[in-house]
Amino acid sequence: MLTMGTALSQQVDANWQTYIMIAVYFLILIVIGFYGYKQATGNLSEYMLGGRSIGPYITALSAGASDMSGWMIMELPGSVYSTGLSAMWITIGLTLGAYINYFVVAPRLRVYTELAGDAITLPDFFKNRLNDKNNVLKIISGLIIVVFFTLYTHSGFVSGGKLFESAFGLDYHFGLILVAFIVIFYTFFGGYLAVSITDFFQGVIMLIAMVMVPIVAMMNLNGWGTFHDVAAMKPTNLNLFKGLSFIGIISLFSWGLGYFGQPHIIVRFMSIKSHKMLPKARRLGISWMAVGLLGAVAVGLTGIAFVPAYHIKLEDPETLFIVMSQVLFHPLVGGFLLAAILAAIMSTISSQLLVTSSSLTEDFYKLIRGEEKAKTHQKEFVMIGRLSVLVVAIVAIAIAWNPNDTILNLVGNAWAGFGASFSPLVLFALYWKGLTRAGAVSGMVSGALVVIVWIAWIKPLAHINEIFGLYEIIPGFIVSVIVTYVVSKLTKKPGAFVETDLNKVRDIVREK
């Protein structure tokens, strides 16, 4: 019987083409980083938001690639492999959430952030939207971004380290440092433009990989009959409603709630050239997402038949895609498929690093230096932004040094944190004139606290009653909505300018 490490080491050691393909991929990213650096004007908005000049197709794939991360290629197939088709509920929830996000959040956010003081970060938008003169809302929301995104970013570094450990038999820490070096390089120098272009490039690679692997796997197994074989091995494998409890299904489906408040995703809407381009972006983005997620599910299902057929001992389900790509393909193609995993991982890391850097620079450093200095010392602020990328990356690497957690748990905690803190607030800010600063702060903080308390003290009680195992975004989101609404009703109403701005945003969005 082959062990995963033996099978992969034999192939990689014998075929240097795999290493060449990875090296070429890294070289392309470095070139894009230089291109972004050459295009930069020394303006903070250019570095952090691409000067709001990004087209619909780059917007669509960069949003998708930065969203899906290594989770789509490593964790989702592994989850389907372990539990069967019932794991697909998360893909349904995510696709629905992303689709609604394009309609409900994207157009208004693009228009409103420019109208409200040309805000380039979410905390800056909240401040301008609610006339937060003492910056309490801006500071708290900025802190939430820095804390949760550092956690989120470290999950990407964990994925990178695990990839090199599994595929090449290299030390986990070496892989972590290598991935970190490349992604820091093009993010540090190229800024938002480089990150967006690399995300587009990486999104294409990811899509090809997620279509190619399950098709070739079926060709090498029993064709479409592979799914019959999978069902014969265990009937629940192809049952959407078996293998998980009702609470489990609801928890997976509820991931879609998080989309409205994920800064690294909705910043894509802020950077597009015009809100009128969003329908094109939506059509491409949702199509890309649907095909990619279905491909990931297909990898997991075919893997159920593939592993015993090839006598492979799969020690970690999250490495299923790696094993299949190395066993089924020529090393050159295998290198391309490993590059797809790196693409998924690095696209998310770079986006998260840049958003966190934006928050540190725009939401904190600007408070120290002052608004006037920010206007007259743009190059200084760009340099602070670059240094912030480096600092956040170093902290995330330090946390990722101990990889004792699953990718989904790491991502799930951060996703829930943003979903409960920001999703209700973003929706209220874009649609409700009655939102107050006190309501916004209270709702945001209560959502984050509920998520933290649920993870730390409630979830461990799941063995007593499964309701305690509910995904933390649900109670966090509900509490945040209630607190935001109640506190806003009880506190001083904002000025008339809010209703005027909301009406103006609505009218602009309706323009054809």
UniProtKB/Swiss-Prot annotation:
One of its GO terms (cellular component) is plasma membrane. InterPro entries: Na/Glc_symporter_sf, Na/Pro_symporter, Na/solute_symporter, Sodium:Solute_Symporter. Belongs to the sodium:solute symporter (SSF) (TC 2.A.21) family. This is Sodium/proline symporter. Signal peptide: none annotated. It is a multi-pass membrane protein. It comes from Staphylococcus aureus (strain Newman). GO terms for molecular function: L-proline transmembrane transporter activity; proline:sodium symporter activity; sodium ion binding. The gene is putP. GO terms for biological process: proline transport. The chain crosses the membrane at residues 16-36, 54-74, 85-105, 139-159, 174-194, 200-220, 240-260, 286-306, 327-347, 381-401, 410-430, 438-458, 467-487. PROSITE patterns: NA_SOLUT_SYMP_3 (PS50283). It is found in: Cell membrane. Keywords: Amino-acid transport, Cell membrane, Ion transport, Membrane, Sodium, Sodium transport, Symport, Transmembrane, Transmembrane helix, Transport. It catalyses: L-proline(in) + Na(+)(in) = L-proline(out) + Na(+)(out). Its main location: membrane. Catalyzes the sodium-dependent uptake of extracellular L-proline. Since most S.aureus strains are L-proline auxotrophs, this transporter may aid the bacterial persistence during an infection of tissues with low proline concentrations.
